[in-house]
Amino acid sequence: MAIPSNRDQLALSNGSHPEEYKIAALVFYSCIFLIGLLVNVTALWVFSCTTKKRTTVTIYMMNVALLDLVFILSLPFRMFYYAKGEWPFGDYFCHILGALVVFYPSLALWLLALISADRYMAIVQPKYAKELKNTGKAVLACVGVWIMTLTTTVPLLLLDEDPDKASSPATCLKISDIIHLKAVNVLNFTRLIFFFLIPLFIMIGCYVVIIHSLLRGQTSKLKPKVKEKSIRIIVTLLLQVLACFVPFHICFALLMLQGEENSYSPWGAFTTFLMNLSTCLDVVLYYIVSKQFQARVISVMLYRNYLRSVRRKSVRSGSLRSLSNMNSEML
């Protein structure tokens, strides 16, 4: 049985992540950063600048893209930490990034709940279709959930307790940096109720009523395209929530109950990866909702195909020229 060296014991006592995790995190977050930045910048530009007739869904999509961008811009700091193995940006900025890990899924779920309620209105209550064009109410709803989420996240920035304050090198961004604060357990479980269970039940309730209405044929007056689009949005939202957000919140609740002191949790790391992945999976939602976004994606794909064809032609023409030159020299 191998005896860990003093260096290994120091690393474990400092709560450092395993080397395999650091490498995986660097690769994963690099991909998420590049793809997510491209997707969400394009989406925000399309929804805010190129969409002529804005609807409530457009407003919600703008907020989703903005939230994704805010979260994505924090990834380079995490990547730097995993690459260097120490945190040089100070305790307060570490608290900000830790709070952002809690803030992002909380607000994202409420925005997805608003989109679900919007689709409920479009399918089950078509007589209120005019409300779907009332962007003012959608803006107020988004402002409300932003303020509500910020208000419950700010207390995490005001806590000074840190179990790794004396560590060398400085550490950050571990599960324990969030869950060790037993003084705010009441706040954490309240947040789980209001920012996970309630929006989740809203989404499930909307989906159940919509499916019930479709099965009973109560939506016969709707255009087939409207039904198809709404169903695709519903399926996309449901799959994204189940894959990215439900595992993260279940893990968070279990860690809070267990009071685990270890800074590294494989299950916590995996569910955090899934939660981060949602910033890229939103591209499916953008593509379904916006024709302008579809056109932009298609144009990029066509342009890439055009560039490939040009390169192939240039390579072929170059090879033909070289052959002709060789023949002329032989003659």
Swiss-Prot record:
GO biological process, one term: negative regulation of tumor necrosis factor production
Residues recorded as bearing Phosphoserine in the entry: 322
InterPro entries registered for this protein in UniProt: GPCR_Rhodpsn (IPR000276), GPCR_Rhodpsn_7TM (IPR017452), GPR18 (IPR028335)
GO terms for cellular component: cytoplasmic vesicle membrane; plasma membrane
Glycosylated residues, chain numbering: 14, 188
Membrane topology: Multi-pass membrane protein
Location in the cell: Cell membrane; Cytoplasmic vesicle membrane
TM spans (from-to): 27-47, 57-77, 96-116, 139-159, 192-212, 237-257, 269-289
Residues exposed to the Extracellular side: 1-26, 78-95, 160-191, 258-268
Record-annotated disulphide pairs: 94-172
Molecular-function GO terms, alphabetical: G protein-coupled receptor activity
Keyword Transmembrane helix (UniProt): yes
Main location: membrane
Keywords from the named record: Cell membrane, Cytoplasmic vesicle, Disulfide bond, G-protein coupled receptor, Glycoprotein, Membrane, Phosphoprotein, Receptor, Transducer, Transmembrane, Transmembrane helix
Pfam families the record matches: 7tm_1
Cytoplasmic topology ranges: 48-56, 117-138, 213-236, 290-331
Function: G protein-coupled receptor (GPCR) that plays a role in diverse physiological processes particularly within the immune and nervous systems. Becomes active when triggered by various endogenous ligands including endocannabinoid N-arachidonyl glycine (NAGly), delta-9-tetrahydrocannabinol or resolvin D2/RvD2 derived from the omega-3 fatty acid docosahexaenoic acid (DHA). Upon RvD2 binding, facilitates the resolution of inflammation, aiding in tissue repair and homeostasis.
Similarity annotation: Belongs to the G-protein coupled receptor 1 family.
Designated name of the protein: N-arachidonyl glycine receptor
Organism whose genome encodes this protein: Rattus norvegicus (Rat)
Source taxonomy: Eukaryota, Metazoa, Chordata, Craniata, Vertebrata
This protein's encoding gene: Gpr18
